[in-house]
Structures are given as structure tokens and as C-alpha cells.
Regions:
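Low-complexity, intrinsically disordered or signal/transmembrane-proximal segments
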Residues: 18, 38-39, 47, 51, ...
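N-terminal amphipathic/hydrophobic targeting modules at extreme N-termini
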Residues: 20-21, 28-29
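SAM-dependent methyltransferase catalytic region
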Residues: 48-49, 57-281
Length: 281
């Protein structure tokens, strides 16, 4: 899969490709471009724009580990980004990959090549800072999980990505917290991952069924925010409404009251202990 990376100070400075439709998401700002003969997924994070060009589909020896089958490549254009490119691209926004609250969206996440590397970097930084404070590591590692979002049309990819992220988190959590590790926190972690990694179509903004066909349910993202020392707030928004919000800043930027009422952007909100977020399913 061909790819390139471009650093810009403003997403609006990017040239508009001819015949291409763009939708921007403020914050981690991710946008999708589509025309008749190619698809391009561009992820804008902290002034870095990553382009994934879906035209080249030949499977050389180097690319074989990047595909699951020729049929999936032909039917879905499914080609995974190699580890070398993943790390090189993450290095462009290295500081953001260390912040537990810096949000990332991968609108075609596959089994989590990008999200897993970002999570590992976030957890490594938390471990460096809070090695002697298991409680702080526990709380902030949950926040780090809540900062990662992914959408994929293939259900097996979604399940694999969720499990991959959980295992990475659980290994670090268990190693650092030892006997203080809690199954209740593990359940909360699985719940957050399940909410954030969605089986859906990022082009139509709808959830899909087991065959990859659109359902009537829209893709909904949850914003996870720590309040005080132990409370976590979850706020739900539809992806389609987030795409309609053009204010720059955070993905979940504060919205005006009339936007909330007229656009129906905000769906629901819960506040609870970070260990008990799964109780509001």
C-alpha cells in the first residue's frame, strides 16, 4: 500500500483533490476522500496528515504479511500497513502518542496495527512516570484506552483489534499493579474498548452487520473524560454529527447549546467511578 506523510499547520492549507469528497472531523481530525477509481483515508493528528493510497494492491513477498487473502484485497481493498511504516508515521507525532488523553481515530483500523503501537507508547510513558504509583497508572491507563477509536467494516478485524488492545493493556496493568490489579478494572477496560472499536462503515457512517452491510444504527463514539480523582464521564455522539461540526480543536469540542438542541449531536451522558463505567451499558 502506497503512503506518504505531510506536515501542515492548518488542515485547510491542503489542496483539494479534483473529484474527491472530503469530510473533516475536528480534533484528531480524520477525513475520508473518495472518487471513482481510488479511495484515500487521511488521518490528521496534531498537524500531521497521513495518506493511505488504496490503489496498489499487488502482493509482493514484503506485502504478504499485510494481507489476509487475495479475495479480501479484491473485495474490500484490505491491505494492512507494515510495522515499519506505522512506527515511522507515529514518530511524526511522537509527543501526542505519549499523552494519555490525546485522541486518535483510525477509520479503517483493521486488526489494530496503528492503535496498538499508539497504546504501547502511551502505556510505556505512563509506566515511566507512575511506576511507583499503581493507582495513578491504573486510572490514567484507562483514560489512554478511552483515547483510541477505530472503525472497520470486517467483524473479524474488529474482534481481533479489541482483543489485541486489551491484551497489550492487561499485560502492562498486571505487571505494574501486581496483586493490586482488579478484575473490575479489567471489565471496565473491555467495555471501553468495545465502545471505541466499532464494526461499521466509515464512509456511510453506519454500523454494519456480519456481512459488512449497513444497518439502521449510526456509528456512535463515546468521549471519556476524567473528573476529579476517580470519576469518569462518558458522553455519546453520533459520528455523522461530529463530521458536521467544523469547529477546530478537540474532536469532542464544547458545542453551543443551540447546536446540541437543533442538531441532536449530544445523545447521553453518564458520570461514574472509572472502575464502574461498564455498569452503564
Amino acid at each position: 500500500m502506497g503512503l506518504s506523510a505531510l506536515l501542515v499547520s492548518d488542515i485547510r492549507a491542503l489542496p483539494e483533490p479534483q473529484g474527491v469528497k472530503r469530510a473533516s472531523v475536528p480534533g484528531f481530525t480524520s477525513f475520508l476522500c473518495l472518487n471513482e477509481n481510488q479511495y484515500v483515508i487521511a488521518v490528521f493528528v496534531a498537524h500531521a496528515v497521513f495518506y493511505f493510497d488504496g490503489i496498489q494492491m499487488t502482493a509482493s513477498e514484503e506485502q504478504k504479511s499485510q494481507i489476509k487473502s487475495k479475495e479480501r484485497v479484491s473485495e474490500r481493498g484490505e491491505v494492512f500497513t507494515a510495522e515499519r511504516e506505522v512506527n515511522a508515521m507515529c514518530d511524526l507525532v511522537a509527543d501526542e502518542c505519549l499523552r494519555p488523553d490525546s485522541r486518535f481515530l483510525e477509520p479503517a483500523c483493521g486488526d489494530g496495527n496503528f492503535l496498538s503501537v499508539i497504546l504501547q507508547r502511551k502505556l510505556s510513558e505512563l509506566k515511566r512516570k507512575y511506576r511507583k504509583s499503581p493507582r495513578d497508572f491504573e486510572k490514567l491507563s484507562i483514560l489512554a484506552l478511552g483515547s483510541l477509536y477505530g472503525v472497520d467494516i470486517m467483524n473479524d478485524n474488529v474482534l481481533a483489534c479489541r482483543e489485541r488492545l486489551f491484551r497489550i493493556w492487561d499485560a502492562e496493568y498486571t505487571a505494574l499493579c501486581g496483586s493490586n490489579a482488579s478484575d473490575e478494572v479489567r471489565e471496565a477496560a473491555r467495555f471501553i474498548i468495545g465502545r471505541n472499536i466499532i464494526n461499521g462503515n466509515a464512509l456511510t457512517l453506519m454500523c454494519v452487520d456480519g456481512e459488512g452491510k449497513d444497518t439502521t444504527a449510526p456509528i456512535v463514539f463515546s468521549e471519556w473524560t476524567l473528573i476529579g480523582t476517580t470519576q469518569m464521564q462518558r458522553s455519546d455522539y453520533t459520528m455523522s454529527d461530529l463530521l458536521m461540526c467544523h469547529e477546530e480543536g478537540s474532536l469532542f469540542a464544547p458545542l453551543l447549546e443551540d447546536q446540541k438542541e437543533e442538531g441532536g449531536i449530544f445523545l447521553r451522558r453518564y458520570v461514574t467511578h472509572y472502575k464502574k463505567v461498564h455498569e452503564h451499558s
